[in-house]
Amino acid sequence: MVDDSTRKTLSNIPLLQIRAGPREKDVWVQRLKEEYQALIKYVENNKQSGSDWFRLESNKEGTKWFGKCWYMHNLLKYEFDVEFDIPVTYPTTAPEIALPELDGKTAKMYRGGKICLTDHFKPLWARNVPKFGIAHAMALGLAPWLAVEIPDLIEKGIITYKEK
């Protein structure tokens, strides 16, 4: 199910060990530290390979995440806001990543711009609790979704390039 390129990307993202969500206040801080370390490593790896494609930050509690992601198509950079909340049942439940400005523009999206990850990503996440975290959700969830959906939306004329 996972191709060699994805397998290589995954092998370079540190696996997490602490099983804690926002409700476990004391242990959540430790889990959050692991999350940040994995995200930093993933972003560093992306930059080194020339495939830098997102920036994320969180609120102080680490429960709300937001930032930008972008997709290059025909040498044009399409940029989108990205956001998600950490579910109270995290890490058992994966975060639902949203691209609000694309809400309603594709069938592979739920209300509020939440991308559809049900078929491929959620079973993989469930098999890897608590080892997978936010960096893994970006690599296995949002990245492949962007790679499939954005070119299709561009070709259909549903989204167009915006000059900065």
UniProtKB/Swiss-Prot annotation:
Q: Name one GO molecular function term.
A: UFM1 transferase activity
Among SUPFAM superfamilies, the record links this protein to:
UBC-like (SSF54495)
- Keyword list, A-Z: Ubl conjugation pathway
Kindly give the CDD domains that the UniProt entry links to this protein.
Answer: UBCc_UFC1
Which InterPro entries does this entry report, sorted A to Z?
Answer: UBQ-conjugating_enzyme/RWD, Ufc1
Example GO BP: protein ufmylation
Phenotype reported upon loss of the gene: RNAi-mediated knockdown shows aberrant neuromuscular junctions in the larval muscle, and abnormal wings together with locomotive defects in the adult.
Q: Which residues form the active site?
A: 116
- What PANTHER family would the database entry show? UBIQUITIN-FOLD MODIFIER-CONJUGATING ENZYME 1
Q: What family does the database annotate?
A: Belongs to the ubiquitin-conjugating enzyme family. UFC1 subfamily.
Relate the protein's function as given in its record.
E2-like enzyme which forms an intermediate with UFM1 via a thioester linkage. As part of Ufm1 cascade, might play a role in the development of the neuromuscular junctions.
Give the quaternary structure.
Interacts with Uba5 (via C-terminus). Interacts with Ufl1.
Descriptive protein name? Ubiquitin-fold modifier-conjugating enzyme 1
Gene encoding it?
Ufc1
